[in-house]
Amino acid sequence: MGIEPSLPQSSPAPAKLTDPYLQIEGGYRLSGEVTISGAKNSSLALMAASLLTMEPCRLHNVPKLADIRMMSAILESLGVRVKPVAANTLDIDPRFLSVHRAPYELVNSLRASFFILGPILARLGMARIPLPGGCAIGARPVDLHVRGLQALGAQVRIEHGIVEARARKLRGGRIYLDYPSVGATETIMMAATLAEGETVIENAAQEPEVVDLANFCRSMGAHIRGAGSKTIVISGVPRLHGSEYHVIPDRIETGTFMAAAAITRSTLRIGPVFPEHLAAVLAKLREMGSVVNLVGPGTLEVSPGRVMAATDIETLPFPGFPTDMQAQFMSVLAVSEGTSIISETVFENRLMHVPELNRLGADIRVRSGHAIVRGVLKLSGAPVVATDLRASAALVIAGLAAHGTTTIAGLHHLDRGYESIERKLQALGARIERHLPSAPPSEVSSAVAAGPDAAAAPV
């Protein structure tokens, strides 16, 4: 499945009785326009890349998310100054980077924290980073990162859960990735910007977030070409300068709202988007019967066709269908006509949302990494628990279509990757609220239950 062996991942922590939860009154259409936030995965990599320079950087379109706050805390623990200066703008001053080791209690909860390894090594000549945490969705090995840094001349050892890398000066090298890992590609690319000589990464990841990182590094003076292709060439430079940069829109949030439109048979306008970042998602959505049109610069309109039909999906590295959209599309296929087969080839443990969707009335069976989805006429509201970030989004989408009340616990997963998702959905007419157990909810508050007139039509 393209997976390399790694240290075992821990099971997701169960939701606590004191945790907040979402309550959704489903079965109603949505209407309106939604604004897409900046890409979480790009933002995290760019924050790490800012460590490569000794001058201040300003990042625009950074989403307000738990993962962003955690990365900010990690950078601050290293002596870096991070300051929000506007709603979605961060100033990062890396001049005072002086600490080469990150605290375990911060790194353990954020897998993207591993991105700081390459920049710290390139700047300080040594880095000590605990093995990272994040969603428990299967093996996500760091050995590709390690081999890449070793090819640049670093001495790397993993001991007692700590990755320690040393290099008096990194040197360019030629690296072939056994798997086009986004994280490994980005780690090597960042470190190589300050290495002596030329570095070539073959079988590199082609995701838009890799291109965004390369563009940011270029804006700081790095010499990178080929990002977005299978071969990336980096010519090292002695130093990088500060930069002001806008993060790309989040293609996964875009796809999530497209799925919400499809499952509720609603017409939504979604932007800003780069359609080329979503080619596989758009193709599958059209196969299933949705009508998708570009109605303005960077704005897509999704509207219902005659029926929602079954289709088969196989997750693949970009430009294939993204694993981060698998769970959301499974929710849509659960109420489509016919039988679909979803093959998860990127992460071997990313079907944990299936039992929760079945609690809502879906008919899904898992066999050897494949999910067989038999479409049903309707879903019914029920209490469910999110097991990871994208599973939480899938449950929200299913809850929007399910008749009756759905409650979703485990919102710490959702808050890692979606900025103000319930407020965005409320603005589209969804009957959704966040509650604390200490204040038991009524069925649905009158303000939310009323909703805008345009959203009152049942699905």
Swiss-Prot record:
<comment type="function">
    <text>Cell wall formation. Adds enolpyruvyl to UDP-N-acetylglucosamine.</text>
</comment>
<comment type="pathway">
    <text>Cell wall biogenesis; peptidoglycan biosynthesis.</text>
</comment>
<feature type="binding site">
    <location>
        <position position="324"/>
    </location>
    <ligand>
        <name>UDP-N-acetyl-alpha-D-glucosamine</name>
    </ligand>
</feature>
<comment type="similarity">
    <text>Belongs to the EPSP synthase family. MurA subfamily.</text>
</comment>
<feature type="active site" description="Proton donor">
    <location>
        <position position="135"/>
    </location>
</feature>
<dbReference type="GO" id="GO:0008760">
    <property type="term" value="F:UDP-N-acetylglucosamine 1-carboxyvinyltransferase activity"/>
</dbReference>
<keyword id="KW-0670">Pyruvate</keyword>
<dbReference type="InterPro" id="IPR050068">
    <property type="entry name" value="MurA_subfamily"/>
</dbReference>
<keyword id="KW-0808">Transferase</keyword>
<dbReference type="GO" id="GO:0008360">
    <property type="term" value="P:regulation of cell shape"/>
</dbReference>
<dbReference type="GO" id="GO:0005737">
    <property type="term" value="C:cytoplasm"/>
</dbReference>
<dbReference type="Pfam" id="PF00275">
    <property type="entry name" value="EPSP_synthase"/>
</dbReference>
<feature type="compositionally biased region" description="Low complexity">
    <location>
        <begin position="441"/>
        <end position="459"/>
    </location>
</feature>
<feature type="modified residue" description="2-(S-cysteinyl)pyruvic acid O-phosphothioketal">
    <location>
        <position position="135"/>
    </location>
</feature>
<keyword id="KW-0961">Cell wall biogenesis/degradation</keyword>
<dbReference type="InterPro" id="IPR005750">
    <property type="entry name" value="UDP_GlcNAc_COvinyl_MurA"/>
</dbReference>
<keyword id="KW-0133">Cell shape</keyword>
<keyword id="KW-0132">Cell division</keyword>
<dbReference type="GO" id="GO:0051301">
    <property type="term" value="P:cell division"/>
</dbReference>
<keyword id="KW-0131">Cell cycle</keyword>
<feature type="binding site">
    <location>
        <begin position="40"/>
        <end position="41"/>
    </location>
    <ligand>
        <name>phosphoenolpyruvate</name>
    </ligand>
</feature>
<dbReference type="GO" id="GO:0071555">
    <property type="term" value="P:cell wall organization"/>
</dbReference>
<protein>
    <recommendedName>
        <fullName>UDP-N-acetylglucosamine 1-carboxyvinyltransferase</fullName>
        <ecNumber>2.5.1.7</ecNumber>
    </recommendedName>
</protein>
<keyword id="KW-0573">Peptidoglycan synthesis</keyword>
<feature type="binding site">
    <location>
        <position position="111"/>
    </location>
    <ligand>
        <name>UDP-N-acetyl-alpha-D-glucosamine</name>
    </ligand>
</feature>
<keyword id="KW-0963">Cytoplasm</keyword>
<dbReference type="GO" id="GO:0009252">
    <property type="term" value="P:peptidoglycan biosynthetic process"/>
</dbReference>
<feature type="binding site">
    <location>
        <position position="346"/>
    </location>
    <ligand>
        <name>UDP-N-acetyl-alpha-D-glucosamine</name>
    </ligand>
</feature>
<dbReference type="InterPro" id="IPR013792">
    <property type="entry name" value="RNA3'P_cycl/enolpyr_Trfase_a/b"/>
</dbReference>
<feature type="binding site">
    <location>
        <begin position="140"/>
        <end position="144"/>
    </location>
    <ligand>
        <name>UDP-N-acetyl-alpha-D-glucosamine</name>
    </ligand>
</feature>
<dbReference type="GO" id="GO:0019277">
    <property type="term" value="P:UDP-N-acetylgalactosamine biosynthetic process"/>
</dbReference>
<dbReference type="InterPro" id="IPR036968">
    <property type="entry name" value="Enolpyruvate_Tfrase_sf"/>
</dbReference>
<dbReference type="InterPro" id="IPR001986">
    <property type="entry name" value="Enolpyruvate_Tfrase_dom"/>
</dbReference>
<feature type="region of interest" description="Disordered">
    <location>
        <begin position="437"/>
        <end position="459"/>
    </location>
</feature>
